[in-house]
């Protein structure tokens, strides 16, 4: 991870497309934040792919493995079983393995969302639906309740 850049300040939405081989251009700004190698995995709370720095992934693995196996076995299978370490090629593309593409419904148009220290990769149609006017109204209500 680039020490001069603050991962917590990383924000933004970036559009990309998948090629026929399942590769996508990973935005330079996001690549700089995560470094030359990072982990991509399913996300528990949404049908998208989560991007982890190697440091954050190691912390997550350590935390989960410190908890009772009886309580975390399903979580370990879900997250660890779907995780892939990836590195951008010379053109800045990363391969999204078929199981992750299928899980997130990625076909062509995608959105990379940088969320203050983490990133998610979404199918564009799912991302647009998530950000519909109805959902935005619910978010505004929740934000006000939380004092944001």
Set out the residue ranges of the language-model regions.
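Flexible "stalk/tail and boundary" regions
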Residues: 1-16, 20-21, 29-86, 90-91, ...
């Amino acid at each position: 991870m680039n020490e001069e850049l603050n991962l917590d300040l990383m924000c933004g939405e970036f559009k990309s497309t998948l090629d026929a081989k399942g590769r996508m251009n990973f935005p330079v700004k996001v690549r700089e934040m995560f470094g030359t190698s990072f982990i991509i995995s399913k996300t528990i709370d949404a049908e998208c792919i989560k991007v982890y720095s190697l440091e954050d992934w190691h912390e997550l693995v350590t935390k989960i493995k410190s908890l009772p196996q009886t309580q975390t076995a399903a979580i370990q299978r879900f997250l660890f079983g779907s995780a892939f370490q990836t590195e951008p090629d010379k053109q800045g593309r990363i391969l999204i393995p078929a199981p992750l593409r299928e899980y997130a419904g990625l076909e062509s148009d995608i959105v990379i969302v940088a969320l203050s220290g983490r990133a998610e990769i979404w199918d564009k149609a799912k991302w647009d639906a998530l950000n519909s006017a109805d959902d935005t109204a619910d978010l505004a209500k929740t934000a006000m309740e939380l004092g944001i």
